[in-house]
Amino acid sequence: MKKILILLSIITVAAVSCGKIIQTEPEDAPQLEVNANNISGQWELVEWNGSYLSEGTYVYLDIVRNDKTYTMYQNMDSFTNVPHVLTGSYYLSTDVELGAIIRGNYDHDSGEWSHRYIIQSLTANEMLWVATDDFSFSQKFVRVDVIPVK
């Protein structure tokens, strides 16, 4: 038993020192109503189609409630650690069959998002998006206090 506790302590310290502890809520965490107020804030993409992002890859969203805009900081399409910053607007609607839908566009005539997403789950600290046109395409976000790449 002592060895197990020591091993768990070592793993925890290693994970914290690597900055990869991902806070997840219990499955019975209360669901929130999907609205601009409840999704506003800073979020980190932690899972893409059920898999964690590769080491060094990041996507952060800063969602603003008042004017329904967002800023995305990401390096998924970059060979450097310099964030690619994208801005735009988002829109929320409700589909009778699918539920809450989020869609958006990019500023500077860069077009619309590739998908519209069902916000399948929203708690105080987690949000799960599933593409309306491909239910196997999912993105899991966790709320963060600070976006470290701003």
Predicted regions located by residue number:
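Sec-dependent signal peptide recognition
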Residues: 2-8
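Ser/Thr- and Asn-enriched, surface-exposed coil loops between beta-strands
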Residues: 94-96, 121-127
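Edge beta-strand at a domain terminus
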Residues: 84-95, 130-150
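N-terminal helix-cap/turn-to-beta initiation motif at the start of protein domains
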Residues: 27-44
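Bacterial signal peptide processing site
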Residues: 19-22
